[in-house]
């Protein structure tokens, strides 16, 4: 609401994407570290043995889902989260690895979700403090013309995005061992 009243389009767009999920690229802080495991019908989820280049490339997974979904997953998981790997990546693994055709999941610590939520919280707090430092206080949620102009000239938030290899469409929560 404040971003809209101050005509801060970039910040308003960022908040909207955090609330509703990202449709395209995600900011760097929304990439989580983890590892992809293959399903073995006799042993369950097993680590994949991959070349260092490929392992590095797939050791990060972007999370485009809304911040509220991340909060729900965080609250309902114990220590490990598992993300479904999309069909194209599954097909690539099945064609280019020595594994028999199978399914794959990306495993990560739930602390990665906490890191994302903390980053969002900190960005909002930093933004509020920056507005206050610049004299933008908005008495009763009403902003003067001077406050609006000052807000337009204040650098608010920078999100840096990177390209990524796969889309996350489902988050499956599995308890860590």
Residues covered by each model-derived region:
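Long, low-complexity intrinsically disordered regions enriched in small/polar
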Residues: 137-177
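Short, Lys/Arg-enriched charge-dense amphipathic segments
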Residues: 7, 31-40, 51-55, 156-168
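Generic hydrophobic secondary-structure signal
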Residues: 1-6, 11-15, 19, 116, ...
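Amphipathic alpha-helical coiled-coil/helical-stalk segments
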Residues: 51-54, 59-150
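N-terminal interaction modules that seed assembly of large macromolecular complexes
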Residues: 1-44
């Amino acid at each position: 609401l404040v971003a809209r009243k101050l005509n801060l389009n970039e910040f308003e767009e960022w908040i909207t994407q955090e609330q509703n999920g990202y449709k395209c690229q995600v900011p760097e802080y929304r990439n989580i570290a983890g590892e992809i495991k293959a399903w073995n019908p006799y042993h369950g989820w097993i680590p994949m043995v991959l070349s260092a280049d490929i392992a590095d490339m797939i050791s990060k997974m972007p999370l485009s889902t809304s911040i509220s979904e991340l909060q729900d997953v965080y609250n309902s998981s114990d220590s490990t989260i598992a993300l479904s790997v999309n069909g194209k990546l599954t097909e690539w693994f099945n064609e280019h690895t020595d594994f028999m055709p199978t399914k794959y999941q990306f495993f990560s610590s739930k602390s990665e979700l906490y890191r994302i939520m903390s980053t969002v919280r900190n960005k909002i707090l930093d933004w509020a403090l920056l507005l206050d430092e610049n004299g933008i206080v908005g008495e009763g949620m009403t902003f003067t013309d001077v406050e609006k102009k000052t807000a337009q000239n204040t650098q608010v938030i920078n999100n840096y995005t990177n390209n990524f290899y796969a889309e996350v469409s489902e988050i499956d929560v599995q308890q860590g061992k």
